[in-house]
UniProtKB/Swiss-Prot annotation:
Signal peptide per UniProt: none
Name of the top EC class for this enzyme: lyase
Keywords: Amino-acid biosynthesis, Cytoplasm, Diaminopimelate biosynthesis, Lyase, Lysine biosynthesis, Schiff base
Protein name: 4-hydroxy-tetrahydrodipicolinate synthase
Protein's pathway: Amino-acid biosynthesis; L-lysine biosynthesis via DAP pathway; (S)-tetrahydrodipicolinate from L-aspartate: step 3/4
Binding site for pyruvate: 45, 204
Main location: cytoplasm
Entries under InterPro entries matching the protein: Aldolase_TIM, DapA, DapA-like, Schiff_base-form_aldolases_AS
GO process annotations (BP): diaminopimelate biosynthetic process; lysine biosynthetic process via diaminopimelate
GO terms for MF: 4-hydroxy-tetrahydrodipicolinate synthase activity
Length: 294
């Protein structure tokens, strides 16, 4: 079962702007040694909007090979074109991903029937599990709980949701409509603690790019009912959770990773490097979490 802290992996680039394969593989290995519960390549944090389809496939293949079945790999396979999403999903399955993460189609704004058609086409095309990624703030559409219910009832491999609505009440609604076994993962580190308390089972996390151990420990504490420890860890992480989103992501989390010597900070346009004032806030957040000692 997919559970705990799952890192929405950044994609390191070299000085020429190409994917830095060595840095990426080393980063994935570090994540595993730190105790992360799963990894999710080529999502928003992995800069999928500015990766070519071939680059997206390249990163998924690298990730699957490096992980070698030690933790689940949830490959990003979203597109606002159904046929493209099907192609990416089929590639992820062929590459050996354990599941796929599929964002609701962005920009073209389908209605609920269109959302059902999109996800059903993907589910029919593969046998591995599908996680719905519902993020109205970026896609401009919100999948209704009833549509989610219909999809998970009609397709056995649609097993859960990454919920980035920031509406904590949705957890209970989705639990009621989709069942207790429907996997609900927060898409927002800032509300992950409360999300778990309402019935969630983890988070597809941005902060865990630099704090995998702390994030995994937070969720483990939730699952054993130790909310006192979970709250202490949440307090350590909260400034970081906020700081890395002061400017458009993933510039903030890539800067934090570079500050810790994990990889370079280069982002692809139209995302741009951070202002110096933002860097100082992230530095302070890293200190607060005990991740930066200098």
């Amino acid at each position: 079962m997919l559970k705990g802290a799952v890192t929405a992996l950044i994609t390191p680039f070299d000085d020429n702007g190409a994917i830095d394969e060595k840095a990426f593989c080393n980063f994935v290995e570090w994540q595993i040694t730190q105790g992360i519960n799963g990894v999710s390549p080529v999502g928003t944090t992995g800069e999928s909007p500015t990766l070519s389809h071939e680059e997206r496939k390249q990163v998924v293949e690298l990730c699957v090979e490096q992980v070698a079945k030690r933790v689940p790999v949830v490959a990003g396979a979203g597109s606002n074109s159904t046929s493209e999403a099907v192609e990416l999903a089929q590639h992820a399955e062929k590459a050996g991903a354990d599941a796929i993460l599929v964002v609701t189609p962005y920009y073209n704004k389908p209605n609920q029937k269109g959302l059902y058609t999109h996800f059903s086409s993907i589910a029919k095309a593969i046998s591995i599990p599908v996680i719905i990624y519902n993020i109205p703030g970026r896609s401009v559409i919100d999948m209704a709980v009833e549509t989610m219910r219909d999809l998970c009832q009609d397709f056995k491999n649609i097993i859960g949701v990454k919920d980035a609505t920031s509406k904590i009440g949705r957890v209970s609604e989705q639990r009621e409509k989709c069942g207790k076994d429907f996997i609900q993962l927060s898409g927002d580190d800032c509300i992950a603690l409360g999300f778990n308390a309402h019935g969630g089972v983890g988070c597809i996390s941005v902060s865990s790019n630099v704090a995998p151990k702390l994030c995994a420990e937070l969720h483990a504490a939730c699952f054993r009912g130790d909310y006192e420890t979970a709250l202490k860890l949440n307090d350590l992480l909260m400034p970081l959770n906020r700081a890395v989103f002061i400017e458009p992501s993933p510039a903030g989390i890539k800067y934090a990773a570079a500050k810790l010597g994990l990889c370079g900070s280069l982002v692809r346009s139209p995302i741009v490097p951070l202002a110096e004032t933002t860097k100082k806030i992230i530095d302070a957040a890293l200190h607060h979490a005990g991740l930066l000692k200098e």
